[in-house]
Amino acid sequence: MAKFEGYLEKQKSRQQYFVYPLLFQEYIYAFAHDYVLNGSEPVEIIGCNNKKFSSLLVKRLIIRMYQQNFWINSVNHSNQDRLLDHSNHFFSEFYSQILSEGFAIVVEIPFSLGQLSCPEEKEIPKFQNLRSIHSIFPFLEDKFLHLHYLSHIEIPYPIHFEILVRLLEXRIQDVPSLHLLRFFLNYYSIWNSLITSMKSVFLLKKENKRLFRFLYNSYVSEYEFFLLFLPKQSSCLRLTSSGTFLQRIHFSVKMEHFGVMYPGFSRKTIWFFMDPLMHYVRYQGKAIFASKGTFFLKKKWKSYLVNFPQYPSSSWTQPQRIRLNQLTRSCFDFLGYFSSVPINTFLVRNQMLENFFLIDTRMRKFDTTAPATPLIGSLSKAQFCTGLGHPISKPIWTDLSDWDILDRFGRICRNLFHYHSGSSKKRTLYRLKYILRLSCARTLARKHKSTVRTFMQRLGSVFLEEFFTEEEQVFSLMFAKTTHFSFHGSHSERIWYLDIIRIDDLVNPLTLN
C-alpha cells in the first residue's frame, strides 16, 4: 500500500496521471483479489472455477504483458474462441478475470485523486455514504406537495462502447489506458455492432461488475452534468473552487458544439431554463425532475435534454424516454413503490353564530403503495408461484434441512415487509405473505413426500405463524408495557427505516437469475 501511495504522490505533481504502468505491478492484482473476497455483496466470478489468487500466475501474466504482440494475440484469440467455444474466454480464464479486475481498479485512480484534491470534500462525515434508501421518500413527501409538474426520464441505455471511451478522455490523459479499455470493450462486444447489444452489456456486467459499474457511473455522471449544472449556475458563478471552474470550462465546450449545430441558440437563452424550485432524484436508470414552473418551461427543458447532451459525446436521448405529466395526475414507479400525489377532498363543517355551512377543502397527499403485479412477477421468476400468483414448491431447495427451508422463506418474507413498510396499503404484502407461506409448506411436503394438509397437521400451523411474525407485531410487544404502540387493525401506517442501504432483490428484477 505504501508503494501505491508513493506512486500517486510522484504523479500528482505532474498534473497528469499515467496509470497504465500500474498494470505491471503485482500488488494491484492483490488489491483486485481482496476486493472480490471482501466485497459488500456476493460476487460471482464466471469461468474461474473459484481459483485462488496465485502470485506466480500474476508474475507470468506480467511477463507476457511485456511481449510485443500480447494484446493483439489475446483479443484475436478471444474473438475466435467466442465463435467456436463460449466457455473459453480470452486466452486464459484466470488471466482475463484478474487483468480486467486490476484494470478496473487502476482506471479509477484519476477520479479518486480528483475527489481527494477538493478541500471542500475532505471532511465529509462517513454516515452520509450510508444513508438509507427510505430517506428519499420523506424528502419527496416534503417537496412534491408544493410542486406542479413531473418529468420521468429514462437514461439512454445501452450505448456504444466508443462513447464511453470518449467520455473518459477528458478525465484520463493516459492514452495507453484508453487503448486498453478499447481492447476490453471490443472483447465484450461480440459482433462490434454500431449499437451495443444488450447481450454484450449483460456479459460485461456479469463477468466484471466493478468495471461495468465504473463505466456506467461515468456515463450517468456525464448525463447528470447537464441536468444539475444549469440549476446551480447562479451559485456556481460566485464560487472559486477548482472543481467548479473545470465544470464551467467543460460546460462552455459543450455550448460551443451546440452553437455550431443550432446557430440561433445563444448563451442568453440558457438563462430561460432557470427554475429556483426544481428537485431531481435518480436511482439506477430512472430519474425524476419535479418543478413548480409552467408547462412551457418544462417543454423547453425536455427539448434541452433531448438535444444538448449529444454534443460532442453523441449520446442522444429519444423524446419518448422523457414523459411530462402534471404531478397530481401522474403515478410514477420509483424504488419499488408506486407513488402519486392525489388531491383528497374533505368537507369541514363550520359554525358562525347560528349559521352552519360546509367548506370543501382540498389537500394533497403523497401516497406510496407496493405494486402487486411486478412483485408477483418477481416471485414467479424466482419460482415461488405461477404467473397468476398461485403458490408452487421450490424443488431446488428440497435437499436442504427443514430449518434452512423455513429460514430462507422467512427471511424473504421479512425482507419484503421490511422494505415495503412505507406502503399505505398492506393488502399486497399480505398476499405475498400467503404465497410464500404456502410455497414453503409445499416445498416441505414435497421433501417429505406427503401432502400439504398431512404435513401441516403433523407440524401445525402455529410454528409457521410464529416464524412469519411481522415487525409491527414485534414493535407492539416491545412497547406494550411502556406506551400505547399498537398496529393491530391498522393497514395504512407507514414506517420508513434508516437501515436499508440497498434495494431488495425481489424489487429489482435485474438481480434475479
Swiss-Prot record:
Location(s), subcellular: Plastid, Chloroplast
The keyword DNA repair is annotated on this UniProt entry: no
Keyword list, A-Z: Chloroplast, mRNA processing, Plastid, RNA-binding, tRNA processing
GO cellular component: chloroplast
InterPro entries the UniProt entry points to: Domain_X, Maturase_MatK, Maturase_MatK_N
Gene Ontology molecular function terms on file: RNA binding
Family: Belongs to the intron maturase 2 family. MatK subfamily.
Function: Usually encoded in the trnK tRNA gene intron. Probably assists in splicing its own and other chloroplast group II introns.
HAMAP family assigned to the protein according to its UniProt record, in alphabetical order: MatK
Name of this protein: Maturase K
Organism of origin: Eleusine indica (Goosegrass)
